[in-house]
């Protein structure tokens, strides 16, 4: 037959053959977590979990050596100063570019105010409750401010997870607010909750300002400025407002050191996460700090954890699971190994 002749078996240039299908990609090449998912996972594992240890460790240092919040804040700021070596090695200015130096310092000031309010609150209210109020206020304020200033909305699943996490915080906090003691103790407790709320507000503002900064080495610059601004503001007050106090035993020194390291890790991870995902979602995922703080409050500080705390923690974890699962999207790389 003519079709069997080699001549007729040559490829026809007038009818190009369909493109060959690309070779099958491996799973890790076909799918990879999106940027938002990476940010949320970093916020969960590197931001929320280490931060959950900060409050109980600070409470232990206060109980062991009567270490005030001002000294705790100064010790934490000291851990930020070695970042100057990294900036020097990279040849970057320590205070950031001159045109946005003021905003970088303002962001650092907001971070210091947030941390200071958190340390003051944790000394008069349970660590879990202080973390609950701070994270709840930061989540709500981040959602409102981002929607108003950046016009960046959320999807249905995100709102469901966000509102669910806030509901969990209300379940944790509600019974405690109804049983506030009267008199001086009740006033100090109320002020502690107010400080925790203001700390969350300052945190949300700091995250929004940080998102607006775009220059190389933004994260290490803001981290160094936070330590510098904190020291410049706290060291004079250390000698004016009170008598300086140092940790009196090895346990207190260990708590201060561990708290400073874990806080720096959490600060760095949150700074990375907020550039990848919505600030409100990052703050919602950081509610894992509350769950960790409640666990440590029971096992380390031997403070009572009510049934409402356990129920609220379960709601928070479920909401975090919804947010994380919604953002666990797979993106095709579109690249084929040669």
UniProtKB/Swiss-Prot annotation:
The chain crosses the membrane at residues 37-57, 67-87, 102-122, 160-180, 190-210, 221-241, 250-270, 281-301, 305-325. Residues 1-27 are annotated as: Disordered. Its main location: membrane. The keyword Transmembrane helix applies. It is found in: Membrane. One of its GO terms (cellular component) is membrane. Keywords: Membrane, Repeat, Transmembrane, Transmembrane helix. Residues 49-174, 272-325 form the EamA domain. It is a multi-pass membrane protein. Expressed in placenta and testis. Pfam families: EamA. It comes from the Eukaryota. The keyword Transmembrane applies. Belongs to the SLC35G solute transporter family. The gene encoding this protein appears to have arisen by SVA-mediated retrotransposition of the SLC35G6 gene in the primate lineage. This is Solute carrier family 35 member G5. It comes from Homo sapiens (Human).
